[in-house]
A protein has these predicted regions:
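Soluble non-cytosolic domains of exported or imported proteins
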Residues: 20, 53, 76-80
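Positively charged n-region of N-terminal signal peptides that target proteins for export
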Residues: 1-4
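Short, cysteine/histidine-rich loop/knuckle motifs that typically chelate Zn2+
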Residues: 32
């Protein structure tokens, strides 16, 4: 029981930091094309994250490899960063 409590206590900050890094990555790498609110920008006809039907795993692949007008981020982001930003987007772009 004590081990479970310890594991849960240690996991909470990791989950929080992953969410925070997703927020930071989104605002530094994604928002210039997809908008601060993730709705996309009409000028570029960039897809909205809010209506995306992609699963988190599919989104990770798009971030990794790129698609249509979106560049690949495989050389700019680590796999952990890609997972963090995809999870952040799929969570609805929370501010905290």
């Amino acid at each position: 029981m004590k081990r479970l409590a310890l594991l849960l206590a240690l996991a909470a900050p990791l989950a929080a930091s992953a969410g925070e890094s997703g927020l930071v990555i989104f605002h530094t790498q994604c928002s210039r094309c997809h908008g601060e609110d993730g709705r996309g920008k009409a000028v570029f006809t960039t897809p909205s994250f809010l209506t995306s039907k992609l699963t988190r795993e599919e989104m990770e692949q798009v971030i990794l490899k790129g698609r249509a007008k979106m560049p690949a981020f495989s050389t700019k982001l680590t796999p952990v960063e890609i997972t963090s930003v995809a999870a952040y987007i799929k969570a609805g772009l929370p501010e905290k």
